[in-house]
Amino acid sequence: MYAVVKTGGKQYKVAAGEKLKVEQIPADIGAEITLDQVLAVGAGDQIKFGTPLVSGASVKATVIAQGRHDKVKIFKMRRRKHYQKRQGHRQNYTELRIEAIVA
């Protein structure tokens, strides 16, 4: 069984037992969270789509880590104008383990 969930403005296809890195969710490590925005649920060749959400469906997950992605380096330059700008960015993430899909 799998589900398509929406969290942090992005959509993820998940199944029970998988690990998933999503945009940061303010929760403690080991906390049980529920993802309520389920867009689709499927098992085998049967798929149930929501309009826009599947009613009564949710995904149970456990927070296993909070971290930061690798640094992304931004470099801007204007040729012949002596303009250079450097910037870096590290995005926070939450790593989840999908425990169960309730549909």
From Swiss-Prot:
The gene is rplU. Pfam families: Ribosomal_L21p. Part of the 50S ribosomal subunit. Contacts protein L20. This is Large ribosomal subunit protein bL21. It comes from the Bacteria. This protein binds to 23S rRNA in the presence of protein L20. Belongs to the bacterial ribosomal protein bL21 family. The keyword Membrane does not apply. GO terms for molecular function: rRNA binding; structural constituent of ribosome. Transmembrane segments: none annotated. The keyword Membrane does not apply. It comes from Cupriavidus metallidurans (strain ATCC 43123 / DSM 2839 / NBRC 102507 / CH34). InterPro entries: bL21-like (IPR028909), bL21-like_sf (IPR036164), Ribosomal_bL21 (IPR001787), Ribosomal_bL21_CS (IPR018258). GO terms for biological process: translation. One of its GO terms (cellular component) is ribonucleoprotein complex. Keywords: Ribonucleoprotein, Ribosomal protein, RNA-binding, rRNA-binding.
